[in-house]
Amino acid sequence: MKHQDVAIIIPSRLSSTRLTRKPLQLIGSSTLIERVFKQVNQTNLEHIYVATDSQEIASVIEKLGGKVIFTDSNIPTGTDRTYEAFKLIPNNQNINYIVNVQGDMPFIEPESILKVIEDLKNSKYDIVTPVVKVEKDSVEAASNVTVAIDSKGKAIYFSRSLIPNGAEEFLYHVGMYGFRKSALERFVALEPTFLEKTERLEQLRLLENGMTIGTCLVNNVPISVDTPEDLSKAVKFYEKSKLV
């Protein structure tokens, strides 16, 4: 089995401010977290875990044969939850790379996850994250994040504003991160930064502290479910696509 030194962790907290019991909302006959897990599981990696504070979520995943790690409800961010889960993986001294896949992307493509892993292993970046080329009309919503990169694909800045200003085509940031273990350990030890708090983007903590984030280009923007409107969009996509 490939990538024995990689763990994929899906943080999934039951409480959500904008969509009640978000991970357990149905898209067709399956819950949101089920769909995320099934997509991630298609990578065929051995070390795939859902990190949660909820027995209900754990039961859903365990019925699918998945592995669950319980984490505290009060952990502030998905990345912090990812690290807490990583520390509880048996024999984690053999894990050198950790991929954080957000638990709100029910149609995330396994190919995108594998591309992040390959690019991380084949580079010297601390972190690798996927981006998608999109037109201006596709990224107007405030919940969407764009990224400016240098000529080699290294991230310069992330923003909820459209960057670079005046462009017609942008790089949409997909909320998934591949970390070297040392980078994840360093991240959680750092205090939140000014830009991070201003933009409400935790990846800016990395940039403000001199860490490097590489980007890898993927084909499709995955639907992220944060609001009732997002859930409706996901249900319509599911029905149109005739997914199982």
Curated annotation (Swiss-Prot):
Pathway: Nucleotide-sugar biosynthesis; CMP-3-deoxy-D-manno-octulosonate biosynthesis; CMP-3-deoxy-D-manno-octulosonate from 3-deoxy-D-manno-octulosonate and CTP: step 1/1; Bacterial outer membrane biogenesis; lipopolysaccharide biosynthesis. It is found in: Cytoplasm. It is an enzyme of class 2 (transferase). One of its GO terms (molecular function) is 3-deoxy-manno-octulosonate cytidylyltransferase activity. The keyword Cytoplasm applies. It catalyses: 3-deoxy-alpha-D-manno-oct-2-ulosonate + CTP = CMP-3-deoxy-beta-D-manno-octulosonate + diphosphate. Its EC number is 2.7.7.38. One of its GO terms (biological process) is CMP-keto-3-deoxy-D-manno-octulosonic acid biosynthetic process. InterPro entries: Cytidylyl_trans (IPR003329), KdsB (IPR004528), Nucleotide-diphossugar_trans (IPR029044). Keywords: Cytoplasm, Lipopolysaccharide biosynthesis, Nucleotidyltransferase, Transferase. One of its GO terms (cellular component) is cytosol. SUPFAM superfamilies: Nucleotide-diphospho-sugar transferases. Activates KDO (a required 8-carbon sugar) for incorporation into bacterial lipopolysaccharide in Gram-negative bacteria. PANTHER family: 3-DEOXY-MANNO-OCTULOSONATE CYTIDYLYLTRANSFERASE, 3-DEOXY-MANNO-OCTULOSONATE CYTIDYLYLTRANSFERASE, MITOCHONDRIAL. Belongs to the KdsB family. This is 3-deoxy-manno-octulosonate cytidylyltransferase. The lineage of its organism: Bacteria, Pseudomonadati, Pseudomonadota, Alphaproteobacteria, Rickettsiales.
